[in-house]
Amino acid sequence: MIDLSFLTEEEQEAIMKVLQRDAALKRAEEERVRHLPEKIKDDQQLKNMSGQWFYEAKAKRHRDKIHGADIIRASMRKKRPQIAAEQSKDRENGAKESWVNNVNKDAFLPPELAGVVEEPEEDAAPASPSSSVVNPASSVIDMSQENTRKPNVSPEKRKNPFNSSKLPEGHSSQQTKNEQSKNGRTGLFQTSKEDELSESKEKSTVADTSIQKLEKSKQTLPGLSNGSQIKAPIPKARKMIYKSTDLNKDDNQSFPRQRTDSLKARGAPRGILKRNSSSSSTDSETLRYNHNFEPKSKIVSPGLTIHERISEKEHSLEDNSSPNSLEPLKHVRFSAVKDELPQSPGLIHGREVGEFSVLESDRLKNGMEDAGDTEEFQSDPKPSQYRKPSLFHQSTSSPYVSKSETHQPMTSGSFPINGLHSHSEVLTARPQSMENSPTINEPKDKSSELTRLESVLPRSPADELSHCVEPEPSQVPGGSSRDRQQGSEEEPSPVLKTLERSAARKMPSKSLEDISSDSSNQAKVDNQPEELVRSAEDVSTVPTQPDNPFSHPDKLKRMSKSVPAFLQDESDDRETDTASESSYQLSRHKKSPSSLTNLSSSSGMTSLSSVSGSVMSVYSGDFGNLEVKGNIQFAIEYVESLKELHVFVAQCKDLAAADVKKQRSDPYVKAYLLPDKGKMGKKKTLVVKKTLNPVYNEILRYKIEKQILKTQKLNLSIWHRDTFKRNSFLGEVELDLETWDWDNKQNKQLRWYPLKRKTAPVALEAENRGEMKLALQYVPEPVPGKKLPTTGEVHIWVKECLDLPLLRGSHLNSFVKCTILPDTSRKSRQKTRAVGKTTNPIFNHTMVYDGFRPEDLMEACVELTVWDHYKLTNQFLGGLRIGFGTGKSYGTEVDWMDSTSEEVALWEKMVNSPNTWIEATLPLRMLLIAKISK
């Protein structure tokens, strides 16, 4: 059963209409299912079409077979019995010692006692006089719902002596409503008082106590005797203070016990299921707190988990007659589970994502709120403070929180700060989420922020977050922060939008010392990473650019300088060793992190900001500007018994210094058997650090037949291993094994070979690598009819490959990868499935890349590569590079813009014929494969 006592009659009627419509739909569905056996003879098909499979699966997963509509319908049918005031017999001093006297001089019902107070048992400890103060009107609602629900949830039935057995229930409920409508709370209480006195004289003492208590409350509320409708006080922010000074010792000891007994007697968790999806940003937040305290802690019983919190503006207390100033009710959840913490889904301003409103917020319009749903444990006069940075870092790594940590109430005009939770669940369940969740600040003044907050009150939580959260400009590093400061009236380019999303995503979490309680332009978003990405992407705060930032070579170079810090190895046989200088011919790479690489979009041109400075590969002809010098000492021998080629690498001397300042390098030797220049044929020695004369004394072994070996070439190259994997080429030696004299003993001895510069293997270009049949299409306006200019899409349809080479004998398991250059990020790369056991695989796979403007088509290039997947490695077979082949991209010379005439013709046809598939069959070739970045 659900406590629906807070619903108005209009709200109940609206819910009943929904329930009636649901019942009508169920009847229609049952009628359809009843006639199904006449039409369908197959039992399995009948099971699927009738929905029987769903209920069987549900029965296995959920024990509760009661539908939500049935629960609400049963709750709506319950009537309100007359008042029972036995909860006030032990509270003679409640009005004096209660915190209500210090707040707003009104009778108040704590949330944990609302609808739960029952007749105490004989063995129960006496309740504390100050533990609860009862609002007469709200007690009628809560007690009525609890008394009617007790036979369903309590282990034993309890009779309320104050419920009249002579008066019919319907008449009692109607009389209560009439009295309430005429005389407000006073009339309602008087009616219940008369019922008590006429019902039982034995309880006259309790009734007199209630009357005396009411008289005291009337003195504090001058407008109550006039029969006017008194508006409930607006709840203030909860203060979690663990030390009490104005409660006596006996009351303190009995208070947790009373709460425990009254709540455990219910037998089942209770939830107030009111949610407002269109609430403002100062709505109540769901605070989950679970901490074991001693009985003298005076806060929470050990057997309870109380989820509650309030965030509101203080100025709403001054003007509570305005509907706009009223804050939504605080929602309190009770759970009888002690050890298990409830799973916390992603929250947006305290709301569960996807949670819809059960009730409409009519109370905001009418200016009414129920004050019986709030309670504040406030005994310590010391003001609470936020945690210091040291405490914050300690709490993120420790599952417990210091008891001295409290919540700061919101000041006037303050902006709610989510995530400042002094509870253990968030810190234990999602420590990484708290540490990694960015702090996103508003770059606006307070007045404009408050004005904008008023305009987004009726929005949903998702929309509300997207309007209330904006990236902080100071968090965006590098040139993107400077570029954002330039304004324009043009549409922001997709590149800048991606820069903004990437910058917002890379912002580290700020310490709590940067968040002030009276600041109105800051908000800390504590939600799941995927939700944070979505909310950050919804923000459009990037000023428009008068020109394309990639049209300037200097700007493009500056952006690519910081990219190498994010490069990493990949197990797809894209060469891990690259030259110290890229095809952009940069003088030196920075080793600082960049916010321009970690992009989540799979579009090619949207994430152009991740322009990689590394387009080197094993087939590239540009290997940096380091001077190649020195010698290497090694020997080779073929062992017939093992059928292995042994390459004994002894040492090197007089190598070039990669670190010019310190005159040292970290060299290692890498060996290939050409033409198989992939990871399957690559062998490497260990890295000898900080020397120009490394000594290895290692043997590199190749398991290969001698007849096949005579068709190979041995390539030994020396590389400097950089900390950030930007490896520099130091020289190489190449031996033609076809002409090698294996019988000459001199060739088996260690010999010195001078190192030479790298030369591109032109002979490999002429080899037949197979063909690819594909089709391209450019869609300039994917969503027609929009007023604002939109970016286009490039569709790549990979149909099949023909006559692929066999590099592993008769085994082949091929697949195709696609990358839109200059974007080499992993997240923008797409690939087909692997098709094995054939040299003519049929893929029939379409890849879509968005974010293309007409001018981007002139600078971009589609790189399609075919790979042979074998165990944990992938071997390159061939590829295409479809573009205009100008050799430049956004004004910068690049070596990947090297399309052949056939590839250029296909790209030109696609650009000149939008919304049309252009088919072609192109020969695969060896490529200068661009290195993949993160």
Swiss-Prot record:
Q: Give the tissue specificity.
A: Isoform 1 is expressed in hematopoietic lineages with a strong expression in CD4 and CD8 T-lymphocytes. It is also widely expressed in nonhematopoietic tissues. Isoform 5 is expressed only in nonhematopoietic tissues. Isoform 4 is expressed in pancreatic alpha cells.
Q: Where is the C2 domain?
A: 628-753, 768-897
Pfam families per UniProt: C2 (PF00168), FYVE_2 (PF02318)
Q: Per its UniProt entry, which superkingdom is the organism in?
A: Eukaryota
Q: Where is each RabBD domain found?
A: 1-57
How the protein is affected by changing E11A? Abolishes interaction with RAB27A
Return the SMART domains for the record: C2 (SM00239)
What the entry lists under Gene3D superfamilies is as follows: 6.10.250.3000, C2 domain (2.60.40.150)
Function summary:
Isoform 1 acts as a RAB27A effector protein and plays a role in cytotoxic granule exocytosis in lymphocytes. It is required for cytotoxic granule docking at the immunologic synapse. Isoform 4 binds phosphatidylserine (PS) and phosphatidylinositol-4,5-bisphosphate (PIP2) and promotes the recruitment of glucagon-containing granules to the cell membrane in pancreatic alpha cells. Binding to PS is inhibited by Ca(2+) while binding to PIP2 is Ca(2+) insensitive.
* Protein name, entry field: Synaptotagmin-like protein 2
Q: Which organism is it from?
A: Homo sapiens
Q: What is the lineage of its organism?
A: Eukaryota, Metazoa, Chordata, Craniata, Vertebrata
Gene name of the encoded protein = SYTL2
